[in-house]
Amino acid sequence: MLTAFIGMPGLGAKLLAMMNSFKLGRSFEIGITIVLLAVTLDRLSKAWVVKQPEHFEKGTPWWQRHFFLVLGLATFVFFMVIAQFIPILDEVGRRQSLSMGKEIDGIIKGFLNFEWVKASTEFIRWFFNLWILIPTERALLFIPTFGVIAAVTGICYTFGGKRPALIGFIFFTIVAALGWWDRAMLTLHSTVTSVFLSFLFGMPLAIWAARTERASRAMIFVCDTAQTFPSFIYLLPAIMLFGITPVTVILAILVYTMVPVVRYTIEGLRGVPPELTEAADMAGATRWQKLWNVQLPLAMPTIAVGLNQALIFAFFMVIIAAFIGTRDLGQEMQRTLAGTHLGKNFTLGFSVVFMALTFDIAINAWAEKRRKMLGL
């Protein structure tokens, strides 16, 4: 998908063109194609890793020991031969395809024409823009450059100590010196806002799922499946509901970053030693007291890993969101990747990397300190 930024042919370039022209039916078909390819390769690699060796009696013929390999090769050769005589087996042309892009477009338009859908999407768009995105964006852009650097340095010192604070100061000073500070702040705004909202929605969901083994397994399965999907796939439903707006970008990143938040929160809560929760029960603690005073504090190092991954995913997703048009570093990178402005490309890339590394180092340092404090 990323190669579509530099004009490489393939499904990525086709998807980019369809999304920019708002042809959601064809976009959905291309997206499903990429997802199926990704899921197939993912499941194949997992099956290969967990496959146990088979043992046969001495003297078993080679073809019996490798029966499925022989069967697969025979099937491959059979279709290679027969495809020379039946053209549709050689390649399914676009005229013979089972495309339902127009029908899907019709279904989407019909769904969006329901009054309750219009009212809901309009309210969400209005609420996010008026009460979340615009105020926080203006506030961040209003703060002077060195005010932001000082704030980041202070946050890094509070969570990680002197080394993360020094690294944060150096990295954000470099970002300021590179000349794309306003776009960097828009990128930071989208990232932090999305991750904050992903925790706001993801934490209650994870806490609920962590209560039982069955719910935990089901939620982890959903997270595994969601992580298999290419990142851009989350843009499609957001575009369908909210059009090409800043709200679309925030909601797509929110859904994408909820996966590590939910996964690591569940793992952290389920990983609390049973004897500690039993001690809390014996002391007469209520469910909420046990959660806030025992389980969450002990799970925080693992939850911090989820926060770290969510931030990294969000910075990555902001760049992907340039497919539908943004005003941040991703948009500038999309404009220059297909050209010969290598210096500008490196400058923009380093700006994103330095911001991401700042938070990565600070969060990891805090998680390590927390583990030592808890004796984990």
Question: Language-model segments: which ranges?
Answer:
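Hydrophobic alpha-helical transmembrane segments of polytopic membrane proteins
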Residues: 11-48, 235, 329-367
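Cytoplasmic-entry segments and transmembrane alpha-helices of multi-pass inner-membrane transporters
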Residues: 168, 176-238, 264-267
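Alpha-helical membrane-interface segments at transmembrane helix boundaries
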Residues: 16, 133-141, 181-189, 193, ...
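Membrane-cytosol interface at the C-terminal ends of specific transmembrane alpha-helices
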Residues: 213-221, 225, 229, 234, ...
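Membrane-spanning helices that line or support transport/gating and their immediate boundary helices
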Residues: 14, 43-51, 183, 187, ...
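Hydrophobic transmembrane alpha-helices
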Residues: 2-5, 36-40, 174, 196-200, ...
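N-terminal, non-cleaved signal-anchor transmembrane helix
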Residues: 43-189, 363-376
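Transmembrane alpha-helices
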Residues: 1-3, 25, 29, 34, ...
